[in-house]
Amino acid sequence: MTRTPTGVPMHLGHTHDAPAAVSADATRPDGTRRALRIGLGGPVGSGKTATVAALCRELRDRLSIAVVTNDIYTREDADFLLKNAVLPPERIQAVETGACPHTAIRDDISANLEAVEDLEDAVGPLDLILVESGGDNLTATFSKGLVDAQIFVIDVAGGDDIPRKGGPGVTTADLLVVNKTDLAPYVGSDLERMALDAKKQRGDLPVAFTSLTSAEGVGPVADWVRAQLAAWAA
């Protein structure tokens, strides 16, 4: 057993059906509608935390947002968000998984589920909670009991063959983000090839190409999030 920084126990090696069932309910125990929860996963260094930061900056003036980060043994991602002041400190909570990242977002969601519920209690009502996974491989996916939709972030520096390789993260995420497009000429990645391969793997599921070197770079992802929020509120 490991613990989150706030002392929340995280039991490894088995699933939790009950929390997943509770989380899937769109209403809180008091009858109010809970926040939309969107998970962000992807390999180490693909730009997940930078994407979370950019989304917070883009959406925070119109929406009530909170973030849960996941790291194996540190608070590094949460500390990055705090240092860059993308949200007030009370709206950012870190979970130290102590195990493979996918364990905490798929196999045993108890610590993350408690973190999102604590945030709703502390700073709610919230419109949106972003749950960032620790860096993982192409098979990483979120439990449907933890998030309502998931974004999978890859980057061109990892190779333009990643969409073709597939894996559940690439093929099933509600949105695939191909990040760091500004680096494509320097690493020999063919963006058109990546788009075609992603289309073959994902069918009609959307793909966004981003470069976060400017504030406008997160625009396609922010637009997708706004559409999810509109559907959630309908």
UniProtKB/Swiss-Prot annotation:
One of its GO terms (cellular component) is cytoplasm. This is Urease accessory protein UreG 1. It comes from the Bacteria. It is found in: Cytoplasm. Disulfide bonds: none annotated. One of its GO terms (molecular function) is GTPase activity. The keyword Signal does not apply. It comes from Streptomyces griseus subsp. griseus (strain JCM 4626 / CBS 651.72 / NBRC 13350 / KCC S-0626 / ISP 5235). Facilitates the functional incorporation of the urease nickel metallocenter. This process requires GTP hydrolysis, probably effectuated by UreG. Gene3D superfamilies: P-loop containing nucleotide triphosphate hydrolases. Residues 1-29 are annotated as: Disordered. GTP binds at G42, P43, V44, G45, S46, G47, K48, T49. Homodimer. UreD, UreF and UreG form a complex that acts as a GTP-hydrolysis-dependent molecular chaperone, activating the urease apoprotein by helping to assemble the nickel containing metallocenter of UreC. The UreE protein probably delivers the nickel. Keywords: Chaperone, Cytoplasm, GTP-binding, Nickel insertion, Nucleotide-binding. Belongs to the SIMIBI class G3E GTPase family. UreG subfamily. GO terms for biological process: urea catabolic process.
